Each structure stands twice: as structure tokens, then as C-alpha cells.
Regions:
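Amphipathic alpha-helical binding modules
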Residues: 70-103
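Short terminal alpha-helical segments
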Residues: 1-33, 88-95
Length: 103
């Protein structure tokens, strides 16, 4: 349960960065990633949520790194606005789903 509560905290921080942060959606996704990278699928107490988290992280790091930029930056450089919004929505949805499960 402790891992799940920590995951909920990090997802809350990521959702907050998306909802109240400044900058473009891509910039806010970058900030949200700094919280998400601290947790892993194993921190999710439910198989469906583990899969959703793994897919989310895969969507954020789908592009190969070029030079020193890293996979996240490479991915954020090629996603369009709609894709970025969908990823952001998935983060917020995962936060709410985990919160409901832990109630």
C-alpha cells in the first residue's frame, strides 16, 4: 500500500504540473515527467493500472534519443498538440483511477 500511496502522490504532483503549470502542454508534460519517473508500474496495485502506467510512460518516451537530448525530449519534439493533450489527459485519468481504487 505504501508504494501505491507514493505513486498517488507522484501522480498528483504530475497532474498539478499539467493543470496549473505554465508553458505549453509539451513543457508541462516535461515537468510532469520529473514526477512520473520516480514511480514504476510495480507501484500500481492493480494490473489494469500497471498496464496504463506502462503505456503512458511508453508514449512519453517512444522516440529514440538523438545526441544528449534523451527519449522524452525526442518524443515531445515530434508529438502534435492533440497527442500531447491526450498524454496529459491520460496522466490525469490515471491519477483519478488510482485515487478511486485507494479510497
Amino acid at each position: 500500500m505504501t508504494d501505491a500511496l507514493y505513486a498517488l502522490e507522484k501522480l498528483a504532483d504530475a497532474a498539478d504540473a499539467l493543470e496549473t503549470g505554465t508553458g505549453s502542454v509539451r513543457e508541462r508534460l516535461f515537468e510532469a515527467f520529473t514526477d512520473l519517473v520516480r514511480i514504476g508500474p510495480e507501484d500500481m496495485p492493480d494490473g489494469e493500472l500497471r498496464l496504463a502506467f506502462a503505456e503512458l510512460m511508453g508514449a512519453l518516451t517512444s522516440e529514440e534519443a538523438k545526441g544528449t537530448e534523451g527519449r522524452l525530449v525526442a518524443t515531445l519534439m515530434i508529438v502534435d498538440e492533440e497527442q500531447a493533450q491526450n498524454i496529459a489527459r491520460a496522466i490525469v485519468d490515471l491519477y483519478h483511477a488510482l485515487g478511486r481504487l485507494l479510497r
